[in-house]
């Protein structure tokens, strides 16, 4: 393939190929190293008692069950709100909006919001959801703050995926007499499932790893609420917040490594479930 190239270009091609391979290997080594370090240091501290109890000085336990439940509650409510809003906004911008200037303004605003530090979202969430709307410091306020944080990501990934659907698909369906919404529901959205799943995975990663915004809005209590409704209206620490508290407030780094390992496994499990759901949807399509 490189026979027609001059010796200098062949050398340059080899150098660039080597650099690309070196970059790929470096990334894989870094990822494997981080995952390995967290698992090696965290797994020895994980036990059934660690996962199924509440932290108690009297009982001498450092369980994280409340934080696990709080994390799952926050993930569920945030995705339940942000996915319909984000996908709907992306569909409007791609399929319905005709004012190009308006679209550009919205896209620019969306990109700007995606780059705002999470601690600012936490401050705004505290002022709006916790104080102005009277929700107080609770999981509901934290979840709504995370909805605002993750909305730009969902919109952007879904919008880019919608743009990859060939225009001929839409025109062909329209020629057969299909309506606009029918085309979107049966052709455009199924073809865009990759982008939607990608946005979902990115959102889950940000939700699980967020601590600054949740410290302002959700709180840091380690108590199991009685019922789902009570949980959302109660102060509660997620796993990422608890990791920070154990490591930097209590100095319990062994427990912090255990929480880190649980977080890592949780993210991997949710990502795997999202990938499997995408495969199932593609098979149905």
Question: Could you say what each language-model-derived stretch is?
Answer:
Residues 3-22, 36-78, 99, 245-254:
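Periplasmic/extracellular loop-to-transmembrane helix junction in inner-membrane transport proteins
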Residues 111-147:
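Generic hydrophobic transmembrane alpha-helix motif, especially the helices
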Residues 56-58, 62, 214-264:
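Interhelical loop and adjacent transmembrane-helix boundary motif
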Residues 93, 159, 163, 201, ...:
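C-terminal transmembrane helix and the adjacent membrane-cytosol boundary/short C-terminal tail
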Residues 79, 158, 180-218:
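Transmembrane alpha-helices
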Residues 69, 73-81, 85, 89, ...:
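Hydrophobic alpha-helical transmembrane segments of multipass integral membrane proteins
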Residues 117, 176-177, 190:
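Glycine/proline-centered hinge or cleavage motifs at structural transition points of membrane proteins
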């Amino acid at each position: 393939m490189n026979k027609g190239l001059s010796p200098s270009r062949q050398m340059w091609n080899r150098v660039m190929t080597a650099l690309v391979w070196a970059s790929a290997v470096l990334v894989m080594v870094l990822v494997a190293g981080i995952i390995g370090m967290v698992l090696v240091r965290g797994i020895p501290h994980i036990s059934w008692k660690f996962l199924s109890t509440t932290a108690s000085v009297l009982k001498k336990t450092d369980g994280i069950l409340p934080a696990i439940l709080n994390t799952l509650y926050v993930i569920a409510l945030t995705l339940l709100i942000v996915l319909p809003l984000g996908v709907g906004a992306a569909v409007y911008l791609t399929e319905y909006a005709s004012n190009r200037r308006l679209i550009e303004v919205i896209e620019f605003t969306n990109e700007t919001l995606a780059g705002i530090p999470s601690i600012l979202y936490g401050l705004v969430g505290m002022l709006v959801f916790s104080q102005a709307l009277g929700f107080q410091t609770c999981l509901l306020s934290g979840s709504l703050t995370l909805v605002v944080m993750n909305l730009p990501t969902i919109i952007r990934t879904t919008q880019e995926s919608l743009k990859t659907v060939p225009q001929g698909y839409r025109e062909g369906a329209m020629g057969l007499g299909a309506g606009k919404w029918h085309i979107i529901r049966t052709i455009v959205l199924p073809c865009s499932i990759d982008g939607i799943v990608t946005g979902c995975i990115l959102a889950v990663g940000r939700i699980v790893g967020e601590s600054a915004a949740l410290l302002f809005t959700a709180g840091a209590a380690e108590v199991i609420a009685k019922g789902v409704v009570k949980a959302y209206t109660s102060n509660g620490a997620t796993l990422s917040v608890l990791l920070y508290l154990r490591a930097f407030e209590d100095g319990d780094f062994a427990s912090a490594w255990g929480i880190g390992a649980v977080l890592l496994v949780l993210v991997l499990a949710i990502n795997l479930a999202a990938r499997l759901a995408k495969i199932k949807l593609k098979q149905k399509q």
